[in-house]
Amino acid sequence: MRGRAGETTMTAALQELAAHIEMKRPDCVISTEIAHDELTVVATPNSIVGLVAFLKTDATCKFSTLIDITAVDYPERAQRFDVVYHFLSMYQNHRIRIRVPVREDDIVPSIISEHPSANWFEREVFDMFGILFSGHPDLRRILTDYGFRGYPLRKDFPTTGYTEVRYDEEKKRVVYEPVNLVQEYRQFDFMSPWEGAEYILPGDEKTDDKAEAKG
C-alpha cells in the first residue's frame, strides 16, 4: 500500500497531466476530475477521435494502450449514456478514463483508426446499450443472438428478458418463445427488516448461548 506521501505524489502528477491536457486540447475537454488516484476527463463526442490521437502521441501522455470501452446508463438524464474509455500509459505509468456523455440518438465516432482493438469493444457497447458508432466497419451484435430484442445493460431492460431459448425435441432444433414464467415474477428485497432472509453466520450460536445463560 502506498503511504500518504505516495498518494500526494501521484495526485500531483495527475494534476499536472490534467492541466497539460486541458491546455493542449481545450476544444475537447469539458472538465477533469481526480479521485482515488485516478484521472477522469469528460470530453465531447465530436472530439473523441482527436483527443484519443493526442493522448496516444503526445510525449507527456503516451497513452498507447486501450484497456476497455464500456458505457453507463443514466435514464433520468437528457444525455442518457456515458461512453467510457480506459487507457494505459506504460511509458508514464499512468491510467486515464475518458467519459463522453451522449444522448440516446447520438452517434459516437469510432476510434478504430487510432486503436484497432476498439473494434470488438465498440461492438459490445452497441450490443449491450444500443449506442451507435460512426465509421465502424462491422457494427453488429457480438454477445447476443442475431434476432435478440433490446439492449440488456440498459436500466429499463426487463430482468426476465423478452424471449427464452430452448431445444425442441420434436422439431430437432433450437426455438425462441415468449418468456413463460412458471410462477409470478417476484422481487426479493433482502435489505428489508420484514422480508430479509435470516442468515446464521459462524459464531452466532455463541451469542445465543450467552443470552440464554444470562436469562
Curated annotation (Swiss-Prot):
MF (Gene Ontology)? NADH dehydrogenase (ubiquinone) activity; NADH:ubiquinone reductase (non-electrogenic) activity; quinone binding
Q: What class of enzyme is it?
A: translocase
EC numbers, comma separated: 7.1.1.-
Record's bilayer topology term? Peripheral membrane protein
Keywords, alphabetical: Cell inner membrane, Cell membrane, Membrane, NAD, Quinone, Translocase, Transport, Ubiquinone
Q: Which GO terms describe its cellular component?
A: plasma membrane
Q: What catalytic activity is recorded?
A: a quinone + NADH + 5 H(+)(in) = a quinol + NAD(+) + 4 H(+)(out)
Q: What is its main location?
A: membrane
Record's subcellular location: Cell inner membrane
Its quaternary organisation is: NDH-1 is composed of 14 different subunits. Subunits NuoB, C, D, E, F, and G constitute the peripheral sector of the complex.
Under the heading HAMAP family, the entry gives:
NDH1_NuoC (MF_01357)
Q: What does this protein do?
A: NDH-1 shuttles electrons from NADH, via FMN and iron-sulfur (Fe-S) centers, to quinones in the respiratory chain. The immediate electron acceptor for the enzyme in this species is believed to be ubiquinone. Couples the redox reaction to proton translocation (for every two electrons transferred, four hydrogen ions are translocated across the cytoplasmic membrane), and thus conserves the redox energy in a proton gradient.
Family membership noted in the UniProt record: Belongs to the complex I 30 kDa subunit family.
What name has this protein been given in UniProt? NADH-quinone oxidoreductase subunit C
Organism expressing this protein natively: Dinoroseobacter shibae (strain DSM 16493 / NCIMB 14021 / DFL 12)
Point out the gene that encodes the protein. nuoC
